[in-house]
Amino acid sequence: VPASDQLTVHVLPARHFSGRGLKRNQTLWASFLFVTPQQKIYYSGDSGYGPHFKAIGDEFGPVDLAIMENGQYDQDWKYIHMMPDETAQAADDLRARAVLPGHAGRSFWRNTAGMNRINGWRLPAKEGPGVC
């Protein structure tokens, strides 16, 4: 979607469900890529890990900054939220040059309360993305 001659917004896949409104799965769940002439910024939104990250990286990567979900995780939610190692792998799949963790320290759901989201991060490789 061209937002202006200086900004294009790509609406891309994410893996989650939609729970807004009276019925589930009646609205779209997505991630976004913001492209300017100078850089590409990816926002994962809530998403479980999946092959969509590699597909996005293959089509649009590398991205300059990936703002990645990292805070509502629990093994029971693995299809809709990522564990820290999956977040790092997704950033690697996107070929992100830098990563900004989202949701860090924001959880109030059952098993995630009090978990330190940043300590679970592992960067995929020495030349992999930096954490902002």
Curated annotation (Swiss-Prot):
Gene3D superfamilies per UniProt: Ribonuclease Z/Hydroxyacylglutathione hydrolase-like
GO cellular component terms, semicolon-separated: cell outer membrane; cytoplasm
Keywords: Cell outer membrane, Membrane
Places the protein is found: Cell outer membrane
Membrane as UniProt keyword: yes
Family membership noted in the UniProt record: To M.tuberculosis Rv0906.
Protein name per Swiss-Prot or TrEMBL: Outer membrane protein RomA
Source organism (scientific name): Klebsiella pneumoniae
